[in-house]
Amino acid sequence: MPGGGPRGTYAREEAPGMKILCAIDGSRHSQWALDWLPHVCSPDDCSLLLVHAVDMAQFKSLSKLDRKTRLAMVNLLECSLEGAARLLEGAELRASTSWDSIRAKLLRGHPAEAVVRSAKREQADLLVIGSRGVTEFQPMLLGSVSRKLLMQAPCPVLVVKKPMTGLKRVVLGADGSIESWEAIAWLTRLPEHSRPSVTVASVIPPLPKESLRLPSRALAVGNQVEGVLRREAKKLAARAAGTLRKAGWSAKGIVLSGPPGAELITLAGRERANLIIVGSRSRRSAHEYFMGSVADTVVKHAPCSVLVYRN
């Protein structure tokens, strides 16, 4: 690596507990991501890997260029690698005030693909990314990099959208899935100093009764179904909140009605939440994920950071 590489302190097999991979791109959002880390995992029980990817695709056809252009491209490549090394070293220095088990690694390849490969290879338990790239001109989540990360990551993804001012209030969307129960278990493992109050929300999606102009008998059946769904949602929210309270947390369960993503976002604004947690089941294709996922809606429009919990 030109200019030397990040120092890296621990081999993977020596690192304890939870394995966190944090993608660094030089933006203020990735700096905020570093500040979030001690609040989601005790540095004594976790290892941290900082990664930055340099896309080498633009340098693959150097042999086809004239000598002057080729030399300029080689110089650009060296500068890119040196800049990436400095970026990682700075991030490692910033994180070292809280963490002992840190490594930093420069990846080569398309950023999303390289980060996903690294997360799989390292068997990461959590991937942390900033919500905007370096340019700030558009949300990172509208681009292909973060789309691929959210779709293909082999672990939960924490999307940092705001600076860390203390993890005080969390909104958790409970739908009875394995992912939402595992998210609750994840919450109970947060460090002692990061024990926020939790609002567990079970959301009943709207039934299309009015739009279909159903006859009165069908409307009555629809109302009965809605009543059953509400009772089940109430049980689910109460059970989830009870699980957290048994673990020593301050938690309450509520039932909401409406589009789940929009309801969770509104609730987070009302509660002034620092974090929304939603589950995301595996999808067969990118189209399915991004054309209707509750997690996608929440990540795009939430007023706070979001943890997308994947099994």
Regions found by a protein language model. Give the residues of each.
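A short acidic, glycine-rich active-site loop
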Residues: 70-86, 220-235
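Small/aliphatic-rich secondary-structure junction motif
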Residues: 8-71, 96, 100-102, 169-223, ...
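Glycine-rich, Arg-bearing micro-motifs that act as flexible, cationic patches
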Residues: 126-148, 167, 275-301, 311
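Short beta-strand elements of ligand-binding domains
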Residues: 130-131, 156-162, 306-310
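Short, structured interface segments
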Residues: 142-163
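Structural beta-alpha unit
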Residues: 2-16, 29, 58, 71-78, ...
